[in-house]
């Protein structure tokens, strides 16, 4: 995001935003993006967020489960949470095999376009869903919101997401919710790629993913780790 865009969204002058960015960059919280004209958050800033005790507890508990999942499936996996109108990846485990596709920690994507976004949305209360829709309407066109809602209906029937990636050919997004009592607090996702020869079929990978997500969910619901 460029300085002028940030200034416009925050209702501040370019000079004010420039000074803020200068300080944040000097302290290592943001850096210039290599892919777009603007800035992105660094691991240091993300670390501050994940050091919040409940999140830290969940990630520490989830890490060995995610490692086991990656070893069994030979696929990378990641955990994502809601961040305003976006999802953000807060933890990732790579497969021990030589070939993999993974999503970096700190990766952000609009909820309306993300696999994790659909899973998070369908597993919320009616009140929370309404709040999320109102937020999405501020950032997306009416057609984009309608498409998101249509996609969510399909996901709600399945209870999980299995869909071709909207961003990378040959990748199938597999995602299950991490549930706290009756709503999703995060998602556990595998970007599935078919290898030659096939190590584990997609349906078997889904079963392993479901088991891992349920194990983490039980820890949150039953207080084994502190709640978000």
Residue ranges of predicted features:
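Extended hydrophobic
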Residues: 141-215
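Conserved segment of winged-helix/HTH DNA-binding domains
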Residues: 44-72, 101
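Amphipathic alpha-helical regulatory segments at dimerization interfaces
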Residues: 9, 20, 61-72, 158, ...
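Short amphipathic alpha-helical signal-transduction/dimerization elements
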Residues: 121, 125, 210-217, 221
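Short hydrophobic alpha-helical segments used for membrane anchoring or interfacial signaling
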Residues: 79-84, 93
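N-terminal helix-turn-helix
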Residues: 1-53, 214-218
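Short, solvent-exposed recognition segments
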Residues: 99-167
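Signal-transducing coiled-coil/dimerization helices and immediately adjacent hinge/linker segments
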Residues: 225-228
């Amino acid at each position: 995001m460029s300085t002028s865009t940030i200034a416009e969204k925050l209702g501040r002058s370019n000079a004010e935003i420039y000074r803020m960015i200068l300080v944040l960059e000097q302290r290592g919280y943001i850096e210039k993006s290599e892919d777009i004209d603007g800035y992105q958050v660094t691991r240091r800033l993300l670390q501050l967020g994940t050091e919040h005790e409940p999140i830290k507890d969940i990630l520490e508990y989830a890490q060995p489960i995610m490692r086991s999942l990656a070893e069994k499936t030979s696929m990378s996996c990641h955990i994502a949470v809601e961040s305003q109108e976006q999802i953000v990846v807060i933890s990732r485990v790579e497969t021990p095999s030589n070939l993999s596709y993974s999503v970096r920690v700190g990766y952000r994507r609009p909820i309306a376009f993300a696999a994790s976004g659909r899973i998070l949305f369908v597993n919320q209360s009616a009140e929370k869903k309404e709040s999320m829709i109102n937020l999405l309407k501020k950032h997306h066109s009416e057609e984009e919101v309608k498409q998101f809602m249509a996609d969510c209906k399909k996901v709600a029937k399945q209870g999980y997401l299995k869909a071709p990636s909207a961003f990378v050919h040959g990748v199938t997004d597999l995602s299950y919710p991490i549930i706290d009592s009756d709503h999703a607090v995060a998602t556990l996702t595998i970007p599935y790629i078919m290898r030659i020869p096939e190590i584990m079929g997609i349906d078997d990978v889904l079963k392993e993913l479901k088991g891992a997500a349920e194990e983490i969910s039980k820890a949150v619901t039953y207080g084994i780790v502190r709640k978000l």
